[in-house]
């Protein structure tokens, strides 16, 4: 075995789950460990495309309540236990998913990020909602000039986070990111799946239709019945906000589907740029089938 731990990451709908299934069938002694921040929630297996899991092989999927504000720090604690358990039982841990913050924190160590007050979060959220994309970007740059070279104008989530941090602390988010805890492990190999965009966009569109057919609307109904705060992570999973609007009568089902597909495609586009620049040691694979054929262990 070349590396004790394998990381398989990549953009959404790139075939990571199917690849892990194929590798498990090929090698057998594998523990597949989730690093998708939304696939941890047990109430939304369909809309987050969780694998049809067998507990002995799939770990950290669908085990957290949607009521919880699960964090990367908690995930790292759970991950460490699962990786060690796999190694102790002569299994190969495969960490897989597309949450960039989770992957980055595993590889580089967890950043000591500050707590952000609810008041600051609310104010930034209102600004993001009420300003145009260009106006919001200009505002963030006026507070933190370092953003210009590091965050693109279309990445509203990271721009909001940067504005929250500098508003709360007076320091740029990039200073906080440099202050990291040591990584949990260093004996890993990372592969990044970046297929052709057209193929991914087509899969995103068809996959969301299948989610609707398989019961995604009922999942979101259950979330609404739980009276969850709209800022909880589970309520922000791709497709959930759009279906919520449909269930409240604000848009039609066709509109909800189209908007969710568009938003997910935009997310995939941002992921392309992010993954290409973040992990220089990663081996980039165009197609998941290529990796299945490789002798990666």
UniProtKB/Swiss-Prot annotation:
Residues the entry annotates as binding substrate: 12-17
Record gene name: miaA
Species assigned in the record: Wolbachia pipientis wMel
Quaternary structure annotation from Swiss-Prot or TrEMBL: Monomer.
Enzyme kind, highest EC tier: transferase
Binding site for ATP: 10-17
Annotated protein name in UniProt: tRNA dimethylallyltransferase
Catalytic activity of the protein: adenosine(37) in tRNA + dimethylallyl diphosphate = N(6)-dimethylallyladenosine(37) in tRNA + diphosphate
PANTHER family in UniProt: TRNA DIMETHYLALLYLTRANSFERASE
GO biological process, one term: tRNA modification
């Amino acid at each position: 075995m070349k590396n004790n731990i394998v990381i398989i990451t990549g953009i959404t709908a790139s075939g990571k789950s199917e690849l892990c299934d194929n590798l498990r069938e090929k090698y057998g002694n594998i523990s597949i460990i989730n690093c998708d921040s939304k696939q941890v929630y047990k109430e939304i297996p369909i809309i987050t495309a969780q694998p049809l899991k067998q507990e002995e092989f799939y770990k950290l999927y669908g085990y957290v309540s949607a009521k919880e504000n699960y964090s990367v720090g908690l995930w790292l604690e759970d991950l460490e236990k699962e990786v060690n358990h796999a190694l102790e039982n002569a299994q190969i841990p495969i960490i897989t998913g597309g949450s960039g913050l989770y992957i980055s924190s595993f590889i580089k160590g967890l950043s000591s990020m500050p707590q952000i007050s609810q008041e600051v979060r609310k104010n930034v959220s209102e600004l993001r909602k009420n300003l145009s994309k260009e106006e919001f970007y200009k505002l963030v740059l006026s507070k933190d000039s370092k953003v210009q070279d590091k965050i693109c104008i279309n990445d509203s989530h990271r721009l909001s986070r940067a504005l929250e941090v500098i508003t709360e602390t007076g320091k740029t988010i990039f200073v906080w990111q440099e202050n990291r805890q040591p990584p949990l492990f260093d004996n890993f190999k990372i592969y990044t799946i970046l297929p052709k965009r057209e193929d991914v966009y087509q899969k995103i569109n068809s996959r969301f239709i299948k989610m609707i057919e398989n019961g995604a609307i009922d999942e979101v109904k259950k979330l609404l019945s739980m009276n969850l705060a709209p800022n909880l992570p589970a309520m922000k999973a791709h497709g959930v906000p759009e279906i919520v609007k449909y269930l409240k009568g604000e848009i039609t089902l066709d509109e909800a589907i189209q908007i969710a597909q568009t938003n997910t495609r935009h997310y995939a586009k941002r992921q392309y740029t992010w993954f290409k620049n973040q992990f220089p040691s990663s081996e980039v694979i165009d197609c998941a089938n290529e990796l299945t054929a490789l002798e990666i262990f």
